[in-house]
Amino acid sequence: MDQFEQLINVSLLKSLIKTQIDENVSDNIKSMSEKLKRLEYDNLTDSVEIYGIHDSRLNNKKIRNYYLKKICALLDLNFKHVIESSFDKNHIVAKLCDATRAKEWQTKSRERRLKNFNLNINYDGPVKIFVAATAEQKLLLKKTRDALLPFYKYISICKNGVMVRRDEKSRVFIVKNEQNIEYLKANKYYAFHSDSVDNFESENDSEKMLQNLI
């Protein structure tokens, strides 16, 4: 092997090593990003976000606790389940003892539909409670609602994405990305024809992107 060939081999080897290093770094960054997202999500599942309380003093813990206690009394919830609370921009974040309690708060809020008047605030506006979610989940929820309401009555954030269902008795679909949204939007016929659901599963491969919960 002459000197020229050796130089070519060395250059090729360096290029291969650099490519391998770049791929490893990229994989590590992706893995770390996924772990951070999971940690962020796990940290939020036992919390709720409360929007709409028309009071400029919500950064004060005593004021927050006053309203949290009022909400608990109105919705038949237990204030002892509240571990801590904070104020973030335009809403209260209440950390509860577990994810089950967070879902309970959201469910009872939907059933009662509180208003500021219920909290002795002279303002005609709703107070809404949601299970806490990441910015990414909230964006997916907004896109799903914009595209699928009113064809699907129930649209809400869940563990694996956004839950979509026609009514209380219909099947549940989990939307994980915009492709899922477009598929359901194109097939909104199924939102009104429950007897056609079986065909929905076998029509083509694209619906396999949707996770169906039985």
Curated annotation (Swiss-Prot):
It holds the Pfam family Baculo_FP. InterPro entries: FP_N. Interacts with IE0. This protein is missing from baculovirus FP (few polyhedra) mutants. This is Protein FP25. The lineage of its organism: Viruses, Viruses incertae sedis, Naldaviricetes, Lefavirales, Baculoviridae. The gene is FP.
